Amino acid sequence: MRTTKLMAGALTLLVLVGGAAAAETVQSSESTVYTLPANVSRIEEYAFYGDGELREIRIPEGVTEIGDYAFANCWYLTEITIPESVTKIGAHAFDSCVSLKTVQLSDNITEMGESAFYRCLSLPEITLPASLTGISARMFENCEGLVTVTVPEGLLEIGDSAFAGCKKLENCPLPPNLTRVGSYAFDKCTLWNAELLPDTLTEIGEYAFRQCKKLTEVTIGEKLLNVGEGAFCDCDGIKKVDWQAKVTRIPDRVFQSCYYIETVKLPETVTEIGEYSFYSCGYLTDIGTFERMKRIGACAFSNCDELVNIGTLDAIEEIGGGAFISDQKLVLSLDGLQHLRIIGGYAFGGCPKVTGLRDLPALEEIGASALDSANIPEVANLPRLRRIGASGLSNRSLVTVGDLPSLEYIGDSAFRNATSLTTFGAAPNVTYIGANAFEECRKLETLGLDGVAAEIGREAFIACTSLKSLDLSNVTSIGEKAFSYCGTLETVVSLESITSLGKNAFEECRSLVTVGKIGNLTRLPNEVFRECKALANVTLPDTMETIGTAAFKHCYGLPEIVIPDSVTTIEEEAFSGCDSLKEIIVPDSVVKMGNHVFGGCRSATRIVFPKYLTYLPGSGVSFCNYMVEFVFPENVKSISNYFFYGCISLKEIVIPDTVTTIDFRAFWDCTSLTRITIPASVTKIDSTAFDGCKKDKLVWVVTPGSYAETYAKKNYYHYVYAK
C-alpha cells in the first residue's frame, strides 16, 4: 500500500523559515512518499543521503535551494518535482539515484552543481530550466538511459564530461548562443546531428564528441578557434568536415579513426597538423593544398588507405614519424623541398608511390624506416644530412647515394637489402655505422667511407659481395660479422686504430689477401678470419695475448704467421686447415693451447711447441701431412688423443722423458712412422694409440724392463733397446 508521510515539524537537515531546526527525522518502513513541511526553505547537504526507503518526495513551494549530496545514493527514488521557488541545485544532489525516472525542474533554477544527476541510470529525458546558462561538469555523466535533453536557448556553456557515457543520448540540439563545449562533454554518446554546431562556439574541449557514432558532418565555424585534442576521434559516421576557422594548427587526434571521412576542407592558414589528426581515416582521398604547411605531426595521416593527394608542401619543414605510414596510394615527390629538415621514423613506410630524395638543402635527418618502401633510385644534394635512422633507406629501388659531407650517423639496417645500390659517395665525417647497415647490398662497389673514424656495428656490411677494398685505418670498433661473406673483398688497408674487434668480423671473405696492421688488441676474436682462403698477409700486434677459437681456420693461402711472444693462449682450431703454412713456431710465452689448434696444416714440415706447455692438446697437429719434425715442450706429460693423427710423413720421433701417458689414437694412421723412442717414464699407452701404423716397419726404442718394452712384447711390436 502506498503510504504518504507528512514530516511533522522541521527535520534536523532542513532549514525552516525563521531559521529554527527540529530535533528528529521521520523513519518508517511504510513511508515511500515524503512530504516536506511547508515552512522549509532549504534542503541541507546530505539531508536524505543514502535513504533506502525514499521512493518519491514532494518539495513545497518556498524551498529555494537543494544542497550538495542532498538525495545522493537514494537508489529507490523514482520521481521528484522541484517547485518554482528553487533557484539552485547543489553538486551531486541526485548522484547515483539509479531508479530516478521523472524529474520536473523549475524554470527559475539558475545554478546546478557538478555531477548533480551523475549516474541516474533510469532517467530517459530531462528539460533543463530556461534560465540556466551553463551545464556544470559531469552533471549527467553515465546517465546510460538518457535519450533526450531539452536545453534552453540561453545556454552558453556545457561543462567537462557533462553527458559523458550517456550511451543512448540522441537528441540534444545545441542552442544558438552556445560558446563552449567542455572536454569529454559528449564522450561515447550516440548523438544525433550535432554537426549543427552553432556559429557562436569559440571552444570545444578535448575528446568532447569522442565515439559519437551518428555524427555525419562537422562544420568548424569561423569563431571556433580552440578545438581540443581528439575532439571528434572515433566518430566513424562522419563523412564530411568543413573547417572554416582560420587556425594555424589542427589539433592532435581530432579526427582519429573517423574511418568513413571522405572530404576534408581545411583553411589555408594551417601551418601544422597535429599527431594522429587523421589517423586511420580510411576513405579520405584528398586533403587539399598546404602552401603554408610547415609541420605534419606523427601518424597524422597514417593508415589512410585511399589517400592519394596532399597537394604542395613547398613550405614543409618537418614530417613526423609515421605521418603517412601504410598510405599505399599516396602520390608525392620529395625532390626540391627547400625547407624540409626532418623526415621522421616510418614517415612514408609502406608508401611505394612516394618518390625523390634530391636537392634537399635543409634536410638534416631521415628517421627509422622513413622511406623503406618508397621509389627512390637516387639520393643526391643533401649537404646538411647528419643522420640516417635504422632502416631509413632500406630500399630495393636505391641505386646511387651521392656525397654526404655532413653525415655522422648511419643507423642499424639503414641500407639493409638495398640490393640495387652500387655507389655510396664520400661521407668523411661518419662516426657510427650501425648493425646490418649495408647488409645484403650485393652490388655495392664504391664505398666512400675510407679513413672515417667510425664505430662499425655487427653485420654492418655482411654479404656485400662486390666490395673490393677498405681503408679502416681510423676505425676504432668493428662488430661481430661486420664484413662476413664479402666474397670479393681483397684488401683491408689497415686496422691500426682498432680497439674492439668482434668475432667472425671477416669470416668467409674468400678473396681477402691483405690485412694491414692490426691495432693494439689483446685478443684476436673467435673465427675473425675463418675461411679467408686467400689471406696471405697479416701481422699480429705485440699486445696480443689470446688468439681466439678458429681465428684463422681454413685460411688456406696463409704462407706464414708470426705469433708474438706476448701471446699466452691459442684456442682450439685457431690455425686449423691453414694448408700453406710451412713452418709453425709457437713462442715459449704460450701456456695454453686448444684442441685441433694446428690440425690440417697439411704443408707444415716443422712444428715447434712452446717450452713450458705441460700437455699436448687433442688433435693438435693431426693431418699435418708433410710434417717431418715436431719439437716437444720440455715438461709435457702426455700425448693427447689424436695428437699426431694422420701425420703421414712423420718417420721418426723421440718422446721426451717427461711423458707418462700416450692417449687414444695419438699416432693413428702415421703410416710412414718407422722409429719411435719411448722413455721409461711412460707408464700408460692406450691400446689404440698406434692404430693404422705399419707394425711391420715400426721399430720401438725402449728401456729394458720398462712399461714400453712390456707393451711392445704384448702387442708384437718390433723393439730395440736404447743406447
Where are these regions (language model features)?
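Short, structured coil segments at secondary-structure junctions
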Residues: K714-Y716
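Sec-dependent signal peptide cleavage junction
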Residues: V17-E30
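Structural signature of tandem-repeat unit edges
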Residues: S28-R42, G52-E65, W75-K88, V98-E111, ...
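Hydrophobic core
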Residues: L11, V15-L16
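Consensus positions within tandem repeat domains that build extended binding/scaffold surfaces
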Residues: E45-A47, G67-A70, G90-D95, G113-Y118, ...
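Bacterial N-terminal signal peptides that target proteins for export
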Residues: M1-A10
